[in-house]
Amino acid sequence: MASVDVQNLRKIYKRDSQDIIVLDGMNLQVPDGEFVALMGPSGSGKTTLLNCIAGIDRPTSGTVTVGGSDVTSLSEGALAKWRSRHVGFIFQFYNLIPVLTAVENVELPLLLLTNLSKKQRRERALTALGVVGLADRAKHYPRQLSGGQEQRVAIARAIVTDPDVLVADEPTGDLDAKSAEDILNLMETLNREFKKTIVMVTHDPRAAARAHVERHLEKGVLTASVSRREAVVGTV
């Protein structure tokens, strides 16, 4: 079963009474456990597609199904609740709250899960920091961390609810080469060892090369696909 299933997705914005077509009948399937990179020039629809998958934006028409849930049919309240449980967000800029420690930042998504005690929230946040290799930085504030460490905290925050899908928008775009490499290694580990489905937008071919599949977009449609799984099979 596809973890993400996008069918006939269209997204149209109005600008000065003109229709701006951002997604034009998009179809995309991402199997459970797949790591997919979305590439294309600016304005090709990559981030809009990612936002529709994550339930941040609503399409004009078409359907988005994630983990068996039809995201496009949910009310605003139900959609917010669904996002908090089933999607983990990783952004180019880390969006950490500067007055909170690393572990407190990671705990934030858990505040929406009312069935957890304070102790359980703290334990899960510490576990997530351990997964990203920052258990020893739990009490550090963002200003005391490097950019790569801040992004690791942001990734811990993304995985702390054990979401069905991780959506990443240019996760290495604000990092130096070494930190970017470390973050991509971590994302590969989350995919391979923790079986996380990942949909990542990137302009960087080196980042895209870590994914199982590259999907190329232009003017709101998929124009090409590169599967590294097939390439590996073909060389055996």
Task: For every predicted segment, state its role.
Residues M1-I12, T223-V236:
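ABC-family P-loop ATPase nucleotide-binding domain
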Residues E214-V226:
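H-loop (His-switch) and adjacent beta-strand-loop-beta switch element
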